[in-house]
Design a protein with these regions (language model features):
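Nucleotide-activated sugar donor-binding and catalytic core shared by glycosyltransferases
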Residues: 1-164
Length: 164
């Protein structure tokens, strides 16, 4: 509860920002997080809560926003593709390869606010505009199928009999 309140306390200061929350993952404590977010949304008119945006709407959403904040892998894997900022909270994604658009921060109000200031500077987006996207450029399934078709599968799929 302390962590979600740190986050919400920081977000409360972003009066000129539109804030959209989506359902927290199935992690321990998600009911508390959801409850606190719903309370926040009731008293902060610049914020909204949606259970889910759905896949198509979610990617359309990522294209439109300036940043996302949270500890979801989406901020590490998908958001950099759109050349947008991710404020990655805590250590849940620790050890993953991250783009320059990802800012790893502690779940502390002041750290969160400093990060929002950092991404509001024009230099931040100039820097990430040409940053490398580490997770490919799409089309992996087509490349996989192409490789599988080249394999000599006569022996590959043959079951072996073991006499016990």
């Amino acid at each position: 509860k302390k962590q979600i309140n740190e986050i919400l306390s920081a977000l409360k200061e972003l009066k000129d920002s539109l804030i959209i929350f989506t359902m927290p993952g199935a992690d321990l404590g998600n009911k508390i997080i959801k409850k606190e977010i719903k309370k926040f949304v009731k008293i902060n008119k610049n914020s909204f809560f949606r259970e889910s945006l759905g896949q198509v709407n979610y990617f359309s959403f990522l294209r439109q926003v300036d940043a996302i904040i949270g500890n979801s892998s989406s901020g590490i894997l998908e958001m950099p593709y759109f050349k947008k900022a991710t404020l990655n909270l805590g250590n849940r994604q620790l050890g993953r390869l991250c783009s320059q658009s990802v800012i790893n921060i502690k779940i502390k109000k002041n750290d969160i606010l400093k990060s929002f200031k950092k991404i509001s500077l024009p230099n931040f987006y100039k820097r990430i505009k040409n940053s490398k996207f580490f997770y490919g450029n799409g089309g992996s399934s087509k490349r996989i199928v192409k490789i599988l078709r080249k394999l000599d599968n006569k022996n590959l799929f043959q079951k072996k009999f073991f006499n016990i």
